[in-house]
Each structure stands twice: as structure tokens, then as C-alpha cells.
Amino acid sequence: MSLLIKNGTIVNDDAMFKSDVLVHDGKIVEIAPSIQPTPGLEVVYATDRLVIPGGIDPHTHMQLPFMGEVAKDDFHRGTEAAVAGGTTMIIDFVIPTKGESLLVAYDRWRGWADPKVVCDYGLSMAITSWSPQIAEEMAMVTKADYGINSFKFFLAYAGVFMVRDEEFYQGMLQCAKLRALARVHAENGAVIAERCEHLLSSGITGPEGHTQSRPEELEAEATFRACTMASQANCPLYVVHVMSKGAAAAIAHHRKKGAVVFGEPIAAGLATDGSHYYNEDWLHAARYVMSPPLSRDPSTPNALMRLLAAGELHLTATDNCTFDCHQKSLGKDDFTKIPNGVNGVEDRMSVVWDRGVHAGIIDPMKFVAVTSTMAAKIFNCYPQKGRIAVGSDADIVIWNANATRTISKDTHHHAIDFNIFEGMQVHGVPETTICRGRIVWANGQLRTVQGAGRFVPLPPDSQIVFSAVDNRGKALEPVKVIRSPYEAPSTLQAHDANANIVVKPTVRTAIPPGGASSIQF
């Protein structure tokens, strides 16, 4: 199949220029100022439009079994929502139950995804327990047959996904050995569990309890701790869903000291805030329950966008994990039973454009970087993904920077009956989405084929992740001091050395040296 994109402005992370793009058999085969159409060639006109790399969402949870429920967006509906929003690749998470084989869990996720995806996808692996078998299986899944190059560790969800600090540290040592990226959900799970118990016993059962049980300081503390431990392990670290200024500051602090740490804000945290948890409508408040929670500071979304612009945060994602109103209502008497998760995979690109480019905070090239290219580089699929270039996959979006749309549950493609961005008008709209040379979204209509997406193996040893690690490791090597042998004196020698010392008995005097005290009792 061949396709020609005419008269558009190509935007990569490092350049913008007018050119045509010729696609054949899923690859970009030519980029030139004026490519002439040939008979039978499908032509897409992109006059006054931007031609950008398809978005890559590096953090989704499609059909995740969680808190006794299963996320509503499966790999079919979830990837349809993705392409409708201009995202052409997702990276989902294999999450084994505690003690489960990584290989068994991997096969289960592939069995769910392969028959359903309408765009390409990769996988990351969560480590929910630690043993020699887990370490061995980590090595196995980083091989080409499995294609995993990152491992996620939860410092929250005590008793379910959470690992202890020593397990986290051992896991990072193994990641460093395998040249795989460690990813972390940074919250203090032990303190959260205590706070939940206290709040419930105090009669606070509504969604406001969720945010009160997880104050921002606990995210900041866990982020700082995770960065410190990763530095000691000389392991690159990727902090998922950075939701607060404190967590972002912890990342910046360690990067300034030379640590290899990446920070990922998500669409929800860039476009809304935690005031919703205090809405008098219980269901409205419950819809926004996710972990870490949205910041209660209304200035945080803008601050996170400015940190993206400054390079202190590095790429955007969604943590898309959707539960409908019925599922959310299962926690009506206990906020700890509200399934955690929100939507985002369909609206991320428009949200970032609106709050970033349209607001004058980032330029279109930075937009491409934080929505596509950085993810491709970090997860080692660049320039196959994340770039408009000859030889790259034809994952392309025709972007109308001047158009607007109003986000609504009535028009979105998620499998849920609400949208956390409901009523928000955003600038920047994907008019056409192309996955591997196939048009999958055009004129407001899906043109997808279930199962047409492919699994993308992600090899370890990404250059942007590991290029600084080896030299840093040399600087961190233990230092041994070479000394002459120490010969301790024997007990007899020590006794003889003290033989001539005169020991005087204690003598009590009426007037001690320095005179008598003037204090009278």
C-alpha cells in the first residue's frame, strides 16, 4: 500500500520544514519538497497542517485487573481511543500477582493484546515480589523473544503490588546489570496505609479521604528516596506520573547531581487538579480518584508544563486505566475501595498542545519531543518510531493546530460513561492518523481493523538512558586503602607499658582546686 502526504509542514523534535512524504508498505520511503502523484496512489493533502510523528503513550493499563474489577478500556477500545487522539503506539504494563512467574504473566498480556490492538504496542514489566527466580526471569524477558526493556516497581499499594526498599534496591541492581530501565510508582505506601485507617476511623469515607490519605509530601519523599536508591545502585530511573511540584523538585535535585532520572507528568496532572475531590457530588469526586492523586494546588498543572519546557521533566503519558461510574460506586462507603484510575489516552495530545503550545510555553518541536520522540528514545525504538524520516515506520498524524474541539463523554471513544476533561475546549486536533501506512482515523471516523497493530519488541541498553551510566559507575566504585599490616600489642606488652604509672587514691579536700563554691544551699 502506498500513500502520499502533500503540502504539509513536517515537525520533528529538532526541525520544522515544508515537504511531501511518500509512504510504501508501512515505511517512509521519500521526503522531498514536491513529489508527484502516480496513478493509483492515495493522496492526503496537508496544506496549512503539521505532519508530525504519531504520539507514543509510554504508560497505559488496558483491561487491567485491579481492586476486584477490570479496567473498561480493553486493548481494542483503548487503542481505538488512542488513534482517535493522534497516538499510534502505547506501552502497557504486564503486572504479575505476587509470586507469579513473569513469563506466565507476559503470555497472558500478549494473549489479551495481540488479537485486539489497532495500533502498535510495547510492554513494560512490573516487579511485585522478589526472589532468585524473579531475577532470573527478568534476564529472560529482556531477550529479543520477549522484548521487555523496563521494569516497574511500586512503592505503594501495600500488600498488593508494593515492594520493600531492599527488594526495590535488589531489583534496580538487576536492572543495571541487564541494561534495563527501572520505573517507579513513588508514594510512601506504609504511611498511606496508616493514614487510610485513621481517616476511616474518623468517619471520613468519601473521595476527599483519598487525597488526604496521600498528601503530596509522601509522593515527594518517595521520589527523593527512589532517586537516592537508584543513584546508589547506579541504575537509571524513570518516575511515572509525576503529580506534584515536590516530586518534580526531587527529580531535578538528583539530575543536578548527575543522576540519570526521567520524569513523566500525565495528561490528567497537566490539565486538572485535586479540587474535584471536594465536590459535593460523590460520584463526580470519585471519577477523579487515581494514585498519586491530582494536586490540590491549582497552580501545579501550569508548573508541570513549565518544567517540561525547561527540560526538568521529559515526556508525557496518561496512566490510562478506566473504570466506569458503576465500578467507581463500589467505594461509596469506603474511599479505599474506589477503583483507582482515569482516562487520558485519547485526549493527551490535544491537552498538551493546548496547555503547552497554544499557551506559549513550548514550541511545536518540543511538543513532538514530549509526546513522541523522547519516549521512542528512552524505550529504544527510535528512529523506527518518533520521527518523520526515510526508513522510519509510517506512524504519522496530520495535525490541525488552529482547530478546536470540546472534550465530552458523548463523543470520546473510551468504554466509560464520563471523561475527567468533560467540557474542556482544547486547541489542536488530529485530523488524520496513520499507523504503519494505514489510515486509521480520518474525518472524525475510525477506520481501524482489530488486531492490525503489532507488538514492538523493545531492546535493552538505550543510548539516552545508559550512555552516562558506565562512566558514572567508575566514579562510584568502592575505594580500598592499602596499608601496612597492623600489629596490635599483646596483653602482656600493654601491662608492662603501664607498670611504672603511679596510681593515686582519691583524696577528698575541704577546698578543691580553684577554690570553694560560693553557692549556698
Regions found by a protein language model. Name each.
Residues 2-4, 10-53:
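Histidine-rich, glycine-flanked metal-binding segment
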Residues 8, 26, 48, 59, ...:
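Divalent metal-coordination and catalytic microenvironments
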Residues 103-119, 169-184, 347:
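Alpha-helix-loop-beta-strand connector modules within alpha/beta enzyme cores
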Residues 133-316, 321, 333:
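Histidine/acidic residue-rich metal-binding segments in metalloenzymes
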Residues 330-334, 340, 390-455:
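C-terminal cap of metal-dependent C-N hydrolases
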